[in-house]
């Protein structure tokens, strides 16, 4: 039995009429084509959880085509469930109950930017009159900040211990959050490279984990006035805390310090001494994980994953109950997963899963030994048409044995088949046995599908993992190549009809495959894969600072001549001229890990040499596609693309929504322009042609995000005050009022002061030519700001578009200048260009205007188009793409 600590979002969807399939579709013996909506569409019901007291079952279900949280009584039918959230922009990806069951908490980011905030809603809350669901409370309320959850103490269920990186984007300070009030209290400022905080079973802060400058992981005992180092493992080893043992004297940890395989151990925080509890009895794989009792906190099971999962039960009653369920469902053909338990462990929710069963969920009463069916995940998906997943091994270069999983299309002889390689992401992860959406989707289309766990994959020990060090595009890629050779030698694969598809590292492996083995593949699909390892490492998000040394050790150090040369050599972009395989590239515009430049660099390189390439860019996605409509569009394009080049079957057409979305995210490669990064040394201060003019400018505005239109009223007032210009922007909308004010130097229009007030947040800043200083305040807590600047700021606060109107605009005019972003607390370089002169109609009238484009010099998707009146220099209209809001758009037009 395999347990998973992350939520499994197994999707279900209503059956829709199958569209006729396109030629070649007549392969005899293959089952009927399964509609792609049943693989990638929205769920009917998924991710069910029991409330701790056993009163409720919560689950995810679509509301207006977006996954939201519903709740029902444990004995009520699902038809009686109540809607608890109304997130229309992006599906809820994860949620959990508080320890006392008073609240359901969930996290949400902005269109894939991975800056998560925590929201709370009570399961018994009632909607306001006319509303469909009760309001959720944003407990953190910070933009551009990533929340990490460290502990939910059992003895204080109204508390969350969490980390916020608002002070320093690279490191999270520790806060105590009171759920009922939203009050946040700083517990520890993180100035010591702390990556995690560990609490005992009584809710006491006992330990911290630290990423040393060398990349080593250190365990620290938290003493009253200092940290004491008690344990460490080096950059090539793995160690991490799990949970304190009852009594709080020792803690369970997993570690492979001075060993090949990860084992389970007990560590004494006072002495740092460890005692091995267990490791794999067969000596082949790492310790996989542990489960602890909700009632007693005792260890109840451990598991290991080789070709299949193997579980060891530490509590007899727990193991007996699992075995009783297994006998009901023909284990090992099907596996039993305990996915949720009540606080007293009287009730379980269990999923019955296999390679051809996405999941059936049952409520198990341990006292009465009764199993009550709840729902079937992907109920309309025809299980009888799905294919077996077979664990295999094959030899690669250096005679290294590579574990893999092979899925062969059902109903046909496994001979001379079109084949698809599916390398996993990470690359420090692995594939394992079970239902796999992509493998089943493409097997249904007639492909043999191979998922190799190439060297560098985790779970098989330190030696196997380290064999992938600095082997991106090298021996790691060889392992994928030798997988193709193995299938060809077995007669399974037609060597002229081999494709490769992958996401993240799998996308890199796709690009590396068509670059370093250009004759091996006949079609390739790269999803959010990096093309240039140098720019990938240069653009990693700040909250990855703790693993920077690990990335350099595993991939190559870009700060050394040898490392830089190796990274460039292993970058597909460097060798793009070798590519002669048809390629489809898909990218999320807001990806914080693999910047859209990674996709567009390779698209431009192929386009410029006249080689055909297809490009999909989703403006509302990040690292991978989360919205079902985007996934449907992606795989509508992918299966047709692969079918045309490899001869597999594909479904013609699909839902109108997916077809419409595919048209929207399809980009003509001819139009792709790589944003140029600005050299900070080339940026000065633009010289205005005229000064500001006192007055008030009123605009009607709209923010468009996730299919919603949010109306706003914006006004800017400019007046002279104390020998300088005072500018105040006032924004009024459904969420209340916000103010942004500035002090602007006369003549030069340099921004000298800025003050922002929005809800509980206030920011006060002063700008010298080379320094930004000030305070960020929220709920009575102040955080200092002190950032070096490369020069004075222009158009960096209220009155910004009015200041731009004062520049000597003319056809072809360009300039660069500096802004300061209080959200990231970094200097931002901006590029301005006059695109055209055109007539424009706004509520205030018809005007001849300069059309001005303003872009960010860091290559992000930030972009503004501003129309400035030629005669009066008034800003008439602004269209802005807001990367900080996940690609939302702002439009404002002058009223008077």
Predicted regions and their residues:
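Beta-propeller domains
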Residues: 59-86
């Amino acid at each position: 039995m395999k347990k998973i600590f992350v939520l499994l979002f197994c999707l279900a969807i209503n059956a829709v009429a199958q569209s006729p399939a396109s030629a070649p579709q007549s392969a005899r013996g293959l089952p009927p084509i399964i509609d792609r909506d049943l693989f990638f569409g929205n769920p009917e019901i998924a991710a069910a959880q029991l409330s701790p007291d056993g009163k409720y079952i919560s689950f995810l279900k679509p509301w207006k085509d977006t996954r939201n949280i519903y709740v029902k009584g444990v004995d009520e039918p699902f038809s009686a469930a109540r809607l608890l959230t109304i997130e229309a922009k992006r599906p809820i990806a994860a949620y959990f109950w508080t320890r006392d069951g008073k609240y359901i908490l969930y996290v949400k980011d902005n269109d894939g930017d991975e800056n998560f905030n925590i929201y709370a809603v009570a399961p018994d809350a009632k909607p306001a009159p006319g509303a469909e669901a009760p309001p959720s409370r944003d407990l953190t309320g910070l933009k551009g900040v990533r929340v990490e959850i460290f502990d939910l103490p059992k003895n204080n269920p109204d508390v969350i211990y969490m980390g916020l990186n608002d002070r320093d984007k690279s490191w999270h300070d520790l806060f105590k959050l009171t759920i009922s009030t939203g009050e946040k209290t700083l517990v520890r400022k993180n100035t010591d490279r702390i990556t995690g905080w560990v609490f005992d079973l009584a809710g006491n802060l006992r330990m911290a984990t630290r990423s040393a400058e060398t990349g080593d992981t250190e365990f620290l005992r938290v003493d009253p006035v200092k940290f004491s180092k008690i344990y460490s493992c080096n950059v090539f080893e793995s160690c991490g805390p799990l949970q304190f043992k009852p009594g709080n004297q020792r803690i369970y940890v997993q570690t492979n310090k001075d060993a090949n395989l990860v084992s389970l151990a007990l560590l004494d925080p006072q002495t740092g001494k460890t005692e091995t509890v267990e490791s794999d009895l067969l000596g082949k794989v790492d310790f996989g994980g542990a489960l602890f009792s909700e009632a007693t906190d005792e260890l109840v099971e451990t598991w290991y994953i080789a070709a299949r999962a193997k579980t060891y039960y530490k509590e007899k009653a727990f193991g007996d109950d699992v075995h009783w369920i297994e006998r009901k469902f023909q284990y090992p053909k099907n596996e039993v997963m305990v996915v949720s338990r009540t606080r007293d462990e009287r009730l379980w929710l269990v999923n019955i899963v296999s390679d051809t069963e996405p999941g059936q969920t049952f409520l198990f009463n341990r006292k009465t030994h009764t199993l009550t069916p709840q729902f079937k995940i992907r109920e309309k998906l025809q299980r009888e048409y799905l294919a077996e997943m077979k664990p295999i091994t094959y030899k690669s270069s250096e005679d290294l044995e590579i574990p893999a999983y092979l899925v062969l299309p059902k109903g046909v002889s496994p001979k001379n088949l079109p084949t698809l390689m599916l390398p996993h992401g990470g690359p420090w992860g692995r594939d394992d046995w079970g239902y796999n959406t992509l493998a089943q989707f493409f097997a249904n289309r007639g492909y043999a599908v191979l998922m190799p766990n190439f060297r560098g994959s985790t779970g098989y020990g330190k030696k196997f993992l380290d064999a992938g060090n600095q082997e991106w595009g090298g021996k790691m890629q060889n392992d994928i190549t030798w997988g193709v050779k193995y299938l060809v030698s077995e007669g399974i694969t037609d060597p002229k009809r081999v494709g490769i598809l992958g996401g993240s590292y799998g996308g890199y492996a796709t690009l590396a495959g068509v670059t370093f083995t250009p004759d091996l593949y006949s079609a390739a699909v790269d999803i959010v894969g990096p093309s240039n390892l140098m720019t990938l490492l240069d653009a990693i998000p700040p909250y990855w600072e703790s693993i920077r040394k690990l990335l350099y050790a595993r991939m190559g150090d870009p700060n050394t001549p040898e490392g830089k040369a190796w990274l460039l050599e292993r970058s597909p972009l460097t060798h793009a001229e070798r590519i002669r395989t048809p390629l489809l590239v898909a990218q999320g515009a807001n990806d914080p890990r693999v910047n859209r430049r990674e996709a567009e660099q390779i698209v431009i390189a192929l386009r410029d040499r006249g080689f055909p390439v297809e490009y999909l860019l989703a403006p509302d996605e990040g690292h991978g596609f989360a919205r079902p409509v985007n996934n449907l569009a992606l795989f509508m394009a992918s299966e047709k693309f692969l079918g045309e080049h490899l001869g597999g079957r594909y479904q013609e057409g699909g839902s109108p929504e997916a077809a419409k979305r595919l048209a929207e995210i399809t980009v003509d490669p001819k139009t792709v322009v790589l944003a140029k990064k600005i050299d900070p040394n080339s940026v000065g201060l633009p010289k205005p042609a005229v000064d500001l003019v006192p007055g008030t400018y009123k605009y009607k505005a709209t923010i468009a995000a996730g299919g919603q239109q949010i109306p706003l009223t914006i006004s800017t007032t400019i007046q002279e005050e104390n020998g300088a210009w005072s500018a105040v922007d006032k924004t009024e909308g459904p969420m209340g009022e916000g103010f942004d004010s500035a002090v602007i130097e006369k003549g030069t229009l340099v921004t000298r002061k800025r003050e922002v007030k929005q809800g509980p947040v206030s920011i006060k800043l002063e700008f010298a030519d080379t320094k930004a200083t000030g305070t960020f305040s929220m709920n009575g807590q102040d955080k200092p700001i002190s950032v070096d600047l490369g020069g004075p700021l222009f158009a960096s606060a209220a009155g910004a578009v009015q200041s731009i109107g004062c520049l000597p605009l003319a056809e072809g005019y360009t300039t660069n200048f500096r802004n300061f972003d209080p959200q990231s607390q970094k200097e931002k370089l901006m590029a301005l260009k006059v695109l055209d002169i055109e007539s424009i109609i706004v509520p205030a009238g018809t005007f001849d205007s300069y059309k001005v484009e303003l872009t960010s010099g860091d290559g992000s998707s930030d972009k503004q188009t501003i129309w400035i009146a030629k005669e009066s220099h008034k800003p008439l209209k602004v269209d802005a793409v807001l990367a900080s809001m996940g690609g939302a758009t702002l439009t404002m037009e002058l009223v008077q």
